[in-house]
């Protein structure tokens, strides 16, 4: 009885606390802010170089930037904007030794932080879903993709996602749900236990993660089918036909390699978001007393914030040479597991997945 009373008093103290405790340090928040801004700026610089290369291409040449990279650019911009709009509020709280509730009249800083946090977390997941859907259509339904999907249409994805996120995350401002302050007083989020909005928000994120994983699995299966069909067609060719349109076969291998690179990048970003969202999902479905006692609220926020920091670094680290290395490892394992057909004339060639001649 006394423990539950103390827990409720602690919750009320966190929601109304005006000053930070003396042992609170801004070190973690500062490192996260610096890493987030630096990673996103480097990723944007690399993407800008690709955009400049695309602009310099002649009218008849192949463009160097794809719809997938348009969506990656929009994801990086979203992560950078979220980092720059959220972290400075936390650093201001530490510098003034005041909680977010006390930082501005009528808890405006607390409401601002909670709204931007929910908005950019949802927008990031919607961007990943858009990227996964683009890959699914490009690989699984190429005819529809060529006729209906364009790079110009990809530019409309960002405002559409922002519009949906704005409507959904504005519900607490319309009295469906409420934003409150959590310990140690440097962050605010959806109130736990008063309405079903927190569970609804977590469920939407979970459904998006499942949808992205479903799209990725479908793309993997389609790539495997394409690889097997291409290998069978090469094996069935006679020696005279093998001396035919070599540039076409080279283009097919390059296309397969690019699709595999896109899939690797998207898969790692999706796994990262799924791992970062797991503590938040657990927190949303826990009862309020247990979540506070086990400090799941603070873990959920930190994991959710880390995602916008990791995403750009994934893109920065997974440059083409690294992706080629990963593809070669995959090809090596595939070739070791697959038995060689005796007398096959194409056994000395690399598979399309490798993207190499």
Swiss-Prot record:
Region (Disordered): 235-255
Free-text function comment from the UniProt entry: Receptor for prostaglandin E2 (PGE2). The activity of this receptor is mediated by G(s) proteins that stimulate adenylate cyclase. The subsequent raise in intracellular cAMP is responsible for the relaxing effect of this receptor on smooth muscle.
InterPro entries per UniProt: GPCR_Rhodpsn, GPCR_Rhodpsn_7TM, Prostanoid_rcpt, Prostglndn_EP2_rcpt
Protein name (database record): Prostaglandin E2 receptor EP2 subtype
Record topology, Cytoplasmic segments: 49-66, 134-152, 225-262, 324-357
Protein family (similarity comment): Belongs to the G-protein coupled receptor 1 family.
Membrane topology classification: Multi-pass membrane protein
GO biological process: one example: positive regulation of cytosolic calcium ion concentration
UniProt key word Glycoprotein: yes
Chief location: membrane
Cysteines joined through disulfide linkages: 110-188
Record: glycosylation sites: 6
GO molecular function: prostaglandin E receptor activity
GO cellular component: plasma membrane
A Pfam family of this chain: 7tm_1
Compositional bias of kind Low complexity: 235-245
Subcellular location as annotated: Cell membrane
Extracellular topological segments: 1-24, 93-112, 178-199, 287-299
UniProt lineage: Eukaryota, Metazoa, Chordata, Craniata, Vertebrata
Transmembrane segments: 25-48, 67-92, 113-133, 153-177, 200-224, 263-286, 300-323
Keywords on record: Cell membrane, Disulfide bond, G-protein coupled receptor, Glycoprotein, Membrane, Receptor, Transducer, Transmembrane, Transmembrane helix
